[in-house]
Amino acid sequence: MDPNTVSSFQDILMRMSKMQLGSSSEDLNGMITQFESLKLYRDSLGKAVMRMGDLHSLQNRNGKWREQLGQKFEEIRWLIEEVRHKLKITENSFEQITFMQALQLLFEVEQEIRTFSFQLI
């Protein structure tokens, strides 16, 4: 995984965890959890691509990996919409910057996962 992507994930997760958005803190915790899950999935997919012939072990481990891939894209779309919504309603510049960076990171990760998945097909 690109070291910049790792540091971006860590930075955004740390900053999001420090935010206090009032009644929506539960929503924010859910977003943080999904970001972490997405990072782990992206890492595992990237490692699978790095190992030649790993498609077979990936299929053996999870016969429905294409379905799982589709679910991850749904999660990414949901997170993008949630981050866009938070960006629209927040007036705090620190939060706006964090959400803009989170949005950019989601687009990058979506593209990376697409690239990895095409390499595995």
Swiss-Prot record:
Residue window of motif Nuclear export signal: 12-21, 85-94
Pfam families per the UniProt record, alphabetical: Flu_NS2
Gene3D superfamilies according to UniProt: 1.10.287.230, S15/NS1, RNA-binding
Main localization of the protein described in the UniProt heading: virion
Biological processes, Gene Ontology terms: exit of virus from host cell nucleus through nuclear pore
Subcellular location: Virion; Host nucleus
Domain of life of the native organism: Viruses
Segment forming the signal sequence: none
GO cellular component: host cell nucleus; virion component
Keywords: Host nucleus, Host-virus interaction, Transport, Virion
Function: Mediates the nuclear export of encapsidated genomic RNAs (ribonucleoproteins, RNPs). Acts as an adapter between viral RNPs complexes and the nuclear export machinery of the cell. Possesses no intrinsic RNA-binding activity, but includes a C-terminal M1-binding domain. This domain is believed to allow recognition of RNPs bound to the protein M1.
Assembly and binders: Interacts with protein M1. May interact with host nucleoporin RAB/HRB and exportin XPO1/CRM1.
Family, similarity comment: Belongs to the influenza viruses NEP family.
Miscellaneous comment in the UniProt entry for this protein: Average number present in a viral particle is estimated to be 130-200 molecules.
Protein name (record): Nuclear export protein
Species assigned in the record: Influenza A virus (strain A/India/6263/1980 H1N1)
Gene: NS
